[in-house]
Amino acid sequence: TEDYALLGYSSGGQIAGVFCGQEVGYPRYNVPRPGVLLLAYPINNFYEAKPIYRWLIDTYSEDLRYYDYNISGCVTPDFPPTYFWYGLNDILLMAFNYYEQGPALQKALARNGVPYHESVYKRAFHGIGIAGGTDAEGWLNDAAAFWEEQTAQAQQPAA
């Protein structure tokens, strides 16, 4: 379980990102912090869809649900190193207010000093998985290299 990677796509990326936070994430489940977080076209903020989800899915619940949290709001200085990517032509992220998605996550990671790699592709729409035949093709290899790099750095003795 040491230095494991947590991978999430789209809304699964949002759940993975929230799991990496202190408030409702891995500490509550008594598991180690992920060694790295790998995200493909993550939804950071469900934005205007939150009331719709509440109305359609959780009509009788007053408790907070996963969609009430933003990944960027869960980022603290001890958040795992994060690799994430998304496309400029991702119409789903545009529908959820584009600047509240990848750009907001990047700002939160930078503000908290969390190591990260962000790739923004011109032609990489939502739901393309490993992205064969798009500008994002090869992202999974890049993400694995980021994971290896972060794991190697974490295992070096402190100076």
Name each region found by the language model:
Residues 1-159:
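Alpha/beta-hydrolase superfamily serine-hydrolase fold, recognizing
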